[in-house]
Each structure stands twice: as structure tokens, then as C-alpha cells.
């Protein structure tokens, strides 16, 4: 009941153009979450919690729209804002 789109990069993107430019299948530095969509409450969090331990990256970062909803979602789910860019926000999730 949830969908997430990811890309693997060695640089944190701040735009969708940079995401396309930096994406490499064999990158290990960052997993970038750029779409999280759920069909019910709690499923976005569930899919992120399920995927994080499986992705084998050093860091887990979002490329998020500049919306209050994105800020609320990521902060509520334990992420820290690490980038306030012209077109996007970046949040980082840390495995505990």
C-alpha cells in the first residue's frame, strides 16, 4: 500500500536534474528517496523502515519538495533536515 522511488548516488542532489545526472547503479555513498507515496496512513513510514536496512548505503537522504507536508512527514519519522535548497529540501535518515 506504499511506493517509494530511490536512486543511488555519490553526491547529494538538490534538483531532479542533478538526481538524473548523479545516479549510478553501483554508487554506495547515498540512497536518495525522491518519491514516497502511500494509500493509507502509516504505510509511508512502514516502507521506509522496511527498506533502510536492505539498501546498503552509507547514508540515506531524501530529495523532497518544498512543502510543509514533506517537512512534517520526515521530521515526524525521525529524519533531520540537512539541506534547504532553492527547489528542494534534503532530509537524512540514520539507522539506529
Regions found by a protein language model. Give the residues of each.
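C-terminal "cap" of GNAT-fold acetyltransferases
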Residues: 87-96
